[in-house]
């Protein structure tokens, strides 16, 4: 791949084809953004089967016109399909939001609750680029914190 997209638009705007192209050429274990994957059921099936993680940034996707409104965002569809995903807030220079505000937005829009967020965070840990012992330590801390929060 030469760094350009089929129609010269950023990968997350170039529909599901750009995700397929990335998978074919780079064989990643995780993909930044990748929300256009939701436009292709076969792609969602592949991501789930291959356990490829999507880093999802809802507010950024609205701000960059990947989706028109937060109600149009495919985060809930991706989650319900069983694809590994995490919720992120993108770079502060792009989207000056916090992870807490992203969670509040998904809670309000899709009726997500702490079980959704715990699941996404555990998936993020599973796909983190660090030693298994550190993943386990963070996983236990996260579960303890969610349990204590009721």
Where are the regions that the model predicts?
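Glycine-enriched alpha-helix->loop->beta-strand junction motifs that scaffold or abut catalytic
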Residues: 23-30, 48-55, 81-84
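A post-motif C-terminal structural segment
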Residues: 76-79, 87
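Catalytic beta/alpha-barrel core
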Residues: 29-38, 63
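Histidine/acidic-residue-rich catalytic or RNA/ligand-binding cores of hydrolases
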Residues: 12-25, 41-47, 64-76, 92-106
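Mid-to-C-terminal alpha-helical segments outside catalytic/metal-binding sites
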Residues: 111-150
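Short acidic/histidine-rich active-site segments
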Residues: 1-13, 83-98
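Conserved, mostly hydrophobic/aromatic
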Residues: 31, 54, 90, 131
């Amino acid at each position: 791949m030469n760094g350009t997209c089929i129609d010269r638009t950023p990968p997350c705007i170039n529909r599901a084809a750009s995700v397929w192209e990335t998978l074919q050429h780079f064989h990643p274990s995780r993909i930044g953004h990748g929300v256009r994957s939701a436009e292709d059921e076969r792609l969602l099936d592949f991501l789930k089967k291959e356990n490829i993680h999507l880093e999802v940034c809802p507010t950024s996707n609205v701000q960059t016109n990947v989706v028109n409104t937060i109600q149009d965002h495919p985060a809930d569809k991706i989650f319900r399909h069983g694809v590994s995903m995490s919720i992120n807030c993108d770079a502060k220079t792009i989207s000056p939001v916090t992870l807490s505000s992203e969670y509040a937005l998904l809670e309000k829009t899709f009726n997500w609750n702490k079980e959704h967020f715990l699941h996404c965070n555990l998936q993020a840990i599973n796909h983190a680029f660090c030693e298994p012992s550190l993943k386990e330590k963070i996983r236990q801390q996260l579960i303890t914190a969610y349990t204590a929060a009721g």
